[in-house]
Amino acid sequence: MLKRTSLSFVNDNLKKKPEWKILDIGCGYRPNDNATVLADIQDLAKLHKNRNFVKIKDKKLPFKDKEFDYVIASHVIEHVEDLEYFIKELERISNKGYIELPSRLGDNLIFENKKDHIWWFSYDDINNEIIASKKNQILEPFVTVSTGKYLEEIFRESLVLELTWENKIDYKIDDNLRNENRMKISFLKLIKKYLSKKIRTLIKK
């Protein structure tokens, strides 16, 4: 079962479960405060020296079946080459968790995402499933990660998908999502149009 949620709602519930073993996979530099175990392909043990950190070395995750009560995968799946295998691994090590993904708009805006992200996502609210395809860069990116994080605070529902799952992560891969025939939008053209419009507006005044 997969459905929409919010990170604040998830965190509030996790705070009420101090006995749970919670994994933050792909924790990066800003792990979830509720996680009892952190994991990443980078060796961040020194950075997280006061927490239980595990370095991921192989495709198969170094954890036992159903080892965790909850697993957090925030901005991770878009980086994974073998999407199907990784999702199966999440289902193997836990029965429930939280998934956070950039929306297609959010992904296209961020400059640093241009080469790092492999997958593009939308969410089917009728069938409650993730729709994934290989990423297509339609909009020339012009926003830095730090600015993107700030924008997420204001326009979170437009830039981020927040999902919770139990027992099974429903998804399908659909390359029609790519809109490959769409014309690429140049940032310079956007600026020119904006300045042109601004100048015309000022002249009218």
Question: What do these predicted ranges mean?
Answer:
Residues 1-18, 190-204:
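Long, low-complexity intrinsically disordered regions enriched in Ser/Thr, Asp/Glu, Pro/Gly
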Residues 9, 15-106:
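Conserved SAM-binding loop
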Residues 84-92, 96-205:
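S-adenosyl-L-methionine-dependent methyltransferase catalytic module, highlighting the catalytic core
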